[in-house]
Amino acid sequence: MNRPPSNPNLRTRATALSSRSRREFIASSASATVLTFMSPALAFGSEANSRVTAGVVGLGGRGGWIAEHVAQHPGFHITAVADYFPEVAHNVGEKLKVPKERCFSGLNGYRSVIDSKVDAIFLETPPYFFPQQARAAVEAGCHVYMAKPVAVDVPGTLSILESGRKSTRNRKVFLVDFQTRTDPFHIEALQKVREGILGKLGLLTSFYHDECFADPPKGKTIEHLLRNLAWVNDTALGGAYIVNCDIHAVDVALWIAGDVPVSAVGYSSRKRPNAQNDSHDCYAISFQFKDGLVMTDHSEHIRNGTPFKSGCYAYGEKACLEAHYGGKTSIRGVEDGYAGGESPELYAEGMRRNVDAFHQGIVEGKHDNPTLEPSVNATLATLLGREAALRGRKVTWEDLLQDTARLELDLTGLKV
């Protein structure tokens, strides 16, 4: 499978992201939450008039789980599925009552789903493949729902930006599935931040700690990496742990900052036992913003019994915000605070709200696609951190945007 060709127009358009004002960034982030928090009753209307034909590409783990939810959703009808592995495609297809002739496999199974004339497509494959898949879906006139991160390198990320903007121009919906931006406690806390409850920000700290995924020995092909999230251990397939996992926390930090960083420095290493693939799993990154705000991001992914925890702390001159993925979000201050609350089921609830929002956008013609630019910015920020650590020096945002190098995979021997 070839990567999408480079488009020189993307560089100018992406550079605009670095010069957007704080107000524009916050407005985009705020609108990203509005669409996802509407009543399902408003979203669905008449089932006969709003049922959308859908295809799901990537059916292992989260992809299969999302496919089951979409199949039960009153607004969608799954008419095609695809997975690299034919047995996975057929097993899920049988469970969802998809005809055998519409259960596709191989690297190009996504194209068969698109060619089956679905209205919408859900992309849940390793992110290396997202730019090509999303571009093909948008060119075919499909609405696109995709996982994060949006890509594994800068050219791929900018390709997603262009595909998303093309969707908007074509009056189609393009949604990236970040769960925290749908959480009512995060939304309310961020509204209070905009109103000034924290005062001037001094420090942001984001973090993500969890165990690593299975890291199988290398084989004759990379097929063994396409199962059980093993691809997260491969930088080209999954972007590396900082891009694939830490992005949840980094995205919240950017949401709070209302801007993108101007530079990053950092360190990273591989500490998981018997590492077979190249992704680093321990990171300590420092980001700087143009207004002097400092942000640190730290994470580790080793099987050492550490319980999952991810979130962000924001320290201002008047108060401190604590925002946890699946935990409590609150603000403590010298004058004012916010009791907030917990969202222990955010992983599932966030997905459900995003699927509802995707359907609502399709049937109501809401195609401003507010999740696009925040998701692109979050991906670029994690790429900035990854590259600063790998290069062992300071890397600026502008340096990053000039990076035309694509991460390449040897797809020899894989089923097309």
Where are these regions (language model features)?
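N-terminal Rossmann-fold NAD(P) dinucleotide-binding loop
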Residues: G63-G64, F130
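Predominantly a Rossmann-like dinucleotide-binding segment in NAD(P)-dependent oxidoreductases
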Residues: G58, R169-L175, T180-N277, I285-F287, ...
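Beta-strand-loop-alpha-helix segment that lines the small-molecule cofactor/substrate pocket
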Residues: D119, P131-T182, G196, G392
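N-terminal twin-arginine translocation
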Residues: S18-E24, T33-S50
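C-terminal helical cap and adjacent loop that interface with cofactors, partners, or active-site loops
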Residues: S28-F37, W65, N244, H248-P261, ...
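N-terminal secretory signal peptides and thylakoid transit peptides that target proteins
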Residues: P5-T33
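NAD(P)-binding Rossmann-fold cofactor-contacting core
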Residues: F76-K95
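A structured beta-alpha segment of the ubiquitous adenosine-cofactor-binding alpha/beta core
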Residues: E101-D119, L123
